[in-house]
Amino acid sequence: MLLSELSHPNQLHGLTVSQLEEIACQIRERHLQVVSTSGGHLGPGLGVVELTLALYQTLDLDFDKVVWDVGHQGYPHKLITGRFSQFDSLRQQNGVAGYLKRSESKFDHFGAGHASTSISAALGMAIARDRKGENYKCVAVIGDGALTGGMALEAINHAGHLPNTPLVVVLNDNDMSISPPVGALSSYLNKVRVSPPLQFLSDSVQESVKNIPLIGKDIPEELKNIKGSVRRLSVPKVGAVFEELGFTYMGPIEGHDIANLIKTFNAAHKLKRPVLVHVVTTKGKGYPYAEADQVGYHAQSAFDLTTGKSIPSKKPKPVSYSKIFGQTLLKICEQDSKVIGITAAMATGTGLDILQKNIPDQYIDVGIAEQHAVTLAAGMSCDGLKPVVAIYSTFLQRAFDQLIHDVGIQNLPVSFVLDRAGIVGADGPTHQGQYDISYMRSIPNFVLMAPKDESELQRMLITSINHNGPTALRIPRGSGLGVAVMDEGWEPMNIGEAEILEEGEDILIIAYGSMVASAIETAKILKNMNINACIVNARFVKPLDKNLIMPLASRIQKVVTMEEGTLIGGFGSAIVELFNDNEINIPVYRIGIPDVLVDHASPDQSKEKLGLLPDQMADKIIKKFKLVI
């Protein structure tokens, strides 16, 4: 059977192992062909091809539910659930999403882009099933990296307390999340992964399953036949943690052996209780370059399939903001041993990998644990250290309570660097960094800032570290503007001080962060129409530079704000509140992201759809204020 002929996963039923292995090869071929052309997540999907095929042969997906954690692993799922022909449009505007999305397919039972949610969602579905008196199966597939997340452990703790609630958790253990996983649980899984194979069940488990009506007497024999794959369920140090938490543990299982996977999953479904199936896979399986560099090939831009090398862009790009941040922080750390860089499983993405390589004593990776990262930093700051927490804007949302309770209320000197702030592109609504201005502006004691270019990033970073209170510095995804940076001697900024970039009397444009460059381009368009704009680089949204902004606004009387974030509670709202509090009655036109979810597309396509390109903004300003050309 050909993969292209699959329109429904139930078509896998009845296929031989040999046929499934043939489809596995086709999935990898299609996966590699598309990702090498347009970019996307590579290693995770390649590692779960056999797991996906085996699992789906044991399920009826017209009824049964499967929740994939994060969605990095979801490409094989998409290819066998009717999206083969559309797969060329992966992560492109109006195309197939890079993550599972309920609105895209009835087989995407739960959407996700953030880690550690799958067990909670699948357990919720299982509880709903039991309350309705139905009998469909509920399965969560979670990676070993995501399993370190607190939410996943909370769900395991809850599920284990419900012994009569059938739930299968498949642990896809490839010893790798995005970066190598960290922590005691990861170390424990390493020990389990290399433990000697045992081919029999514990007496206690055999006795318990024999009591299951009708089928119980057959299960132990069926499990015994999974030769060389299932290791003893209750031997100390092999699955003991999960069994103590109320799960029946099965594994470790070879994750690329379809026949044994099918037997194991069928046996797990029959147990009718919480079961954890530990499957050991190889991230990037089937593509040697991805197997050899599992971090680098987690996600890739377009690359040459033959050499594995990225296809260089036609025009060289400036260094990314993330790298400038990492390089600058390294220099600061070398000068001050009290400065500590903290990341939550995103060392490479945030630029902190340079600390990991050069000064590991001043680098901490807490794993997928944003809440812990924030409060860890709070505790460190109490005793004289200077923590710098680098987290994607979208992931810091997960630690909102800690920002308030553990940092803001106590006014602790913790520096937060929010990477991927603003529009991020192809990862879609789960990853857009559009909310941080709004949610952080409400927290007392915080200073919020955003640079217009690389040089300001360096100055703001040293300002943050020197400030005796909490700060948040947002930086956009991707390349900088090509502005020269310094290796040392960065001049701290005055907190709350804005700057005038261009003088003008017809319109006042106050821009924040990444939108400053767009404001300058917009002003050029307006100037060609004989409209002279005064441009202010706000630098800070909290506190605002009242002494600069209010006199300018009072004089010019027409104000435009620009931000790459949600308008609700954002930078523009702060300006409106400033004027209202000071009884200044001046019209303010706010330009930013309206109350919508920003779908997957390139950043420029998203900005065009939102009306955030310079020519669009110039046109909006002219129409809003009825400016005479």
Curated annotation (Swiss-Prot):
<dbReference type="GO" id="GO:0008661">
    <property type="term" value="F:1-deoxy-D-xylulose-5-phosphate synthase activity"/>
</dbReference>
<dbReference type="InterPro" id="IPR033248">
    <property type="entry name" value="Transketolase_C"/>
</dbReference>
<comment type="similarity">
    <text>Belongs to the transketolase family. DXPS subfamily.</text>
</comment>
<dbReference type="InterPro" id="IPR029061">
    <property type="entry name" value="THDP-binding"/>
</dbReference>
<dbReference type="InterPro" id="IPR020826">
    <property type="entry name" value="Transketolase_BS"/>
</dbReference>
<dbReference type="Pfam" id="PF02780">
    <property type="entry name" value="Transketolase_C"/>
</dbReference>
<keyword id="KW-0414">Isoprene biosynthesis</keyword>
<dbReference type="InterPro" id="IPR049557">
    <property type="entry name" value="Transketolase_CS"/>
</dbReference>
<feature type="binding site">
    <location>
        <position position="72"/>
    </location>
    <ligand>
        <name>thiamine diphosphate</name>
    </ligand>
</feature>
<feature type="binding site">
    <location>
        <begin position="113"/>
        <end position="115"/>
    </location>
    <ligand>
        <name>thiamine diphosphate</name>
    </ligand>
</feature>
<keyword id="KW-0784">Thiamine biosynthesis</keyword>
<dbReference type="InterPro" id="IPR009014">
    <property type="entry name" value="Transketo_C/PFOR_II"/>
</dbReference>
<keyword id="KW-0786">Thiamine pyrophosphate</keyword>
<dbReference type="GO" id="GO:0005829">
    <property type="term" value="C:cytosol"/>
</dbReference>
<feature type="binding site">
    <location>
        <begin position="145"/>
        <end position="146"/>
    </location>
    <ligand>
        <name>thiamine diphosphate</name>
    </ligand>
</feature>
<dbReference type="GO" id="GO:0030976">
    <property type="term" value="F:thiamine pyrophosphate binding"/>
</dbReference>
<dbReference type="Pfam" id="PF13292">
    <property type="entry name" value="DXP_synthase_N"/>
</dbReference>
<dbReference type="GO" id="GO:0016114">
    <property type="term" value="P:terpenoid biosynthetic process"/>
</dbReference>
<keyword id="KW-0479">Metal-binding</keyword>
<comment type="subunit">
    <text>Homodimer.</text>
</comment>
<keyword id="KW-0460">Magnesium</keyword>
<feature type="binding site">
    <location>
        <position position="174"/>
    </location>
    <ligand>
        <name>thiamine diphosphate</name>
    </ligand>
</feature>
<feature type="binding site">
    <location>
        <position position="370"/>
    </location>
    <ligand>
        <name>thiamine diphosphate</name>
    </ligand>
</feature>
<dbReference type="GO" id="GO:0000287">
    <property type="term" value="F:magnesium ion binding"/>
</dbReference>
<dbReference type="GO" id="GO:0019288">
    <property type="term" value="P:isopentenyl diphosphate biosynthetic process, methylerythritol 4-phosphate pathway"/>
</dbReference>
<dbReference type="GO" id="GO:0052865">
    <property type="term" value="P:1-deoxy-D-xylulose 5-phosphate biosynthetic process"/>
</dbReference>
<feature type="binding site">
    <location>
        <position position="144"/>
    </location>
    <ligand>
        <name>Mg(2+)</name>
    </ligand>
</feature>
<dbReference type="Pfam" id="PF02779">
    <property type="entry name" value="Transket_pyr"/>
</dbReference>
<dbReference type="InterPro" id="IPR005475">
    <property type="entry name" value="Transketolase-like_Pyr-bd"/>
</dbReference>
<comment type="pathway">
    <text>Metabolic intermediate biosynthesis; 1-deoxy-D-xylulose 5-phosphate biosynthesis; 1-deoxy-D-xylulose 5-phosphate from D-glyceraldehyde 3-phosphate and pyruvate: step 1/1.</text>
</comment>
<dbReference type="GO" id="GO:0009228">
    <property type="term" value="P:thiamine biosynthetic process"/>
</dbReference>
<comment type="function">
    <text>Catalyzes the acyloin condensation reaction between C atoms 2 and 3 of pyruvate and glyceraldehyde 3-phosphate to yield 1-deoxy-D-xylulose-5-phosphate (DXP).</text>
</comment>
<protein>
    <recommendedName>
        <fullName>1-deoxy-D-xylulose-5-phosphate synthase</fullName>
        <ecNumber>2.2.1.7</ecNumber>
    </recommendedName>
</protein>
<feature type="binding site">
    <location>
        <position position="174"/>
    </location>
    <ligand>
        <name>Mg(2+)</name>
    </ligand>
</feature>
<dbReference type="InterPro" id="IPR005477">
    <property type="entry name" value="Dxylulose-5-P_synthase"/>
</dbReference>
<feature type="binding site">
    <location>
        <position position="287"/>
    </location>
    <ligand>
        <name>thiamine diphosphate</name>
    </ligand>
</feature>
<keyword id="KW-0808">Transferase</keyword>
